[in-house]
A protein has these predicted regions:
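Short, hydrophobic secondary-structure boundary micro-motifs
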Residues: 20-23, 108-110, 159
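Short gly/pro-enriched beta-turn/loop segments at secondary-structure junctions
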Residues: 112-114, 189-192
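Mixed-charge, Lys/Arg-rich low-complexity intrinsically disordered regions
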Residues: 155-191
Length: 246
């Protein structure tokens, strides 16, 4: 499953309680989470990774780590925002979030939903990973209090799982049956066609495979990998571009 937006949908299906998408807030929580993933995240990263923040973030890492990171971001084709512009935007977004959490414990009520988690992670990065830049948060104490409530949710239980372990599991497993959802054709590309899917806003590398599902919300490609065997790769429709393979 590619993209956290789709992964959240899958988690909601596997574990419906507690809800990520409250029934009366499904639309607005998705829209807010999409804004946080793109706009808020972009402003926060551009703010945090200006020279002072980048120097602190990469301090103590092996020589060449910062340059490798810059080259990786450049290859992804992400647009660079001037630090002053990012700072102004980030401050504005923090004030907007403060307005929301002054009325409720969480963004849309008494319990956190997908919107809270989407908004929290770039702010968490500012506070925990680049603390030399975290002074921007002090102007919005309501946001800091909300962040404390989010942190109190805990981190769950993590287990180390290497890339090779994941490949081994995939090689020994079969793809799950596809959901019984209607084929929604927006491109004039029939099922069974060789296609590529590419992220709309970052990362130029296409994923190629056979289109085996195109529902209202996602695409599924069948691929055969020499190491992982037969796999199904799922993408959300929003944010990804479907094309016939050349």
């Amino acid at each position: 499953y590619c993209d956290t937006a789709l992964i959240c949908d899958v988690l909601e299906h596997l574990q419906p309680e507690p809800v990520l998408y409250p029934p009366h807030l499904k639309g607005v929580s998705r829209v807010f989470a999409q804004w946080a993933d793109m706009v808020l995240f972009g402003a926060a990263m551009a703010y945090c990774l200006q020279p002072r923040g980048a120097q602190a973030l990469f301090a103590g890492l092996p020589d060449g780590a910062a340059e490798a990171f810059r080259n990786d971001r450049r290859a992804m084709g992400t647009a660079r925002t001037h630090p002053a512009d990012a700072t102004a935007a980030y401050r504005s977004y923090l004030r907007r979030i403060a307005n929301m959490v002054e009325e409720h414990d969480f963004l849309f009520g008494a319990e956190p939903c997908v919107a809270d988690f989407a908004a929290y992670h770039p702010l968490w990065f500012t506070r925990e990973c680049v603390p030399v830049m975290a002074d921007i948060l002090s102007a919005t104490p309501a946001v800091l209090e909300w962040m404390d409530r989010m942190a109190a949710q805990g981190q769950g239980r993590a287990e180390k799982f290497s890339a090779q372990d994941a490949v081994t599991v995939a090689a020994g497993a079969l793809p799950q049956p596809l959901p019984a959802e209607a084929f929604q054709d927006e491109h004039g590309i029939p099922l069974g066609s060789r296609v590529t899917i590419t992220a709309e806003s970052f990362g130029p590398e296409p994923t190629e495979g056979t289109l085996i599902a195109a529902t209202r919300t996602r695409y599924t490609l069948a691929r055969t990998d020499p190491r992982a065997g037969d796999v199904h790769v799922h993408f959300p429709r929003v944010g990804y571009v479907l094309r016939r393979a050349a």
